[in-house]
């Protein structure tokens, strides 16, 4: 893993141009005055696209967390080994992150709302596949959890892009913070 991290660092250092850190330092930063968080929340509340974006992110996260957390427990009840459980969760994580660039490109090509819809449909399919799988059927659970991760990726990436497009520049950071808060509270409550 250290070798992979070192290689990734070298690739990023060589090919990431322009450096986002340097670009950010050159641009003027809009600072929110005290009380502007309330204005940002009001801006989101009055913006149907922003609300839809945050809702889709939260729904995707609740579905993902609920199924992801319970699957290892379900498998352990019939004495599936930790190695197999770990493999199923690894396949899930692959679904969450491996196709992120593709999901972003699809979001640009097909539109944010369409990719969110695809994500919700994928999440629904994943719960059906996982829900009907036997606890010792690692293959079917792996497929279900892969789809779960992929659906989550679709709702999160397209939802975040839609949110960013839907709010004024002055409210982008506060809106993303509100989205993260809602997403994580929803996941904890789900």
Map each language-model feature to its residues.
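C-terminal ends and interior cores of transmembrane alpha-helices
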Residues: 122-135
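Short amphipathic helix-loop junctions that connect adjacent transmembrane helices
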Residues: 69-85
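Pair of pore-lining "gating" transmembrane helices in MFS-fold secondary transporters
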Residues: 45-63, 146
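A late C-terminal transmembrane helix in Major Facilitator Superfamily
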Residues: 170-190
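Juxtamembrane intracellular "pre-TM" segments in multi-pass secondary transporters
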Residues: 18-53
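C-terminal membrane-cytosol helix-exit motif in multi-pass small-molecule transporters
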Residues: 3-26
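Helix-to-loop junctions at the C-terminal end of transmembrane segments
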Residues: 98-112
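Intracellular juxtamembrane helix-capping segments at the cytosolic ends
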Residues: 154-167
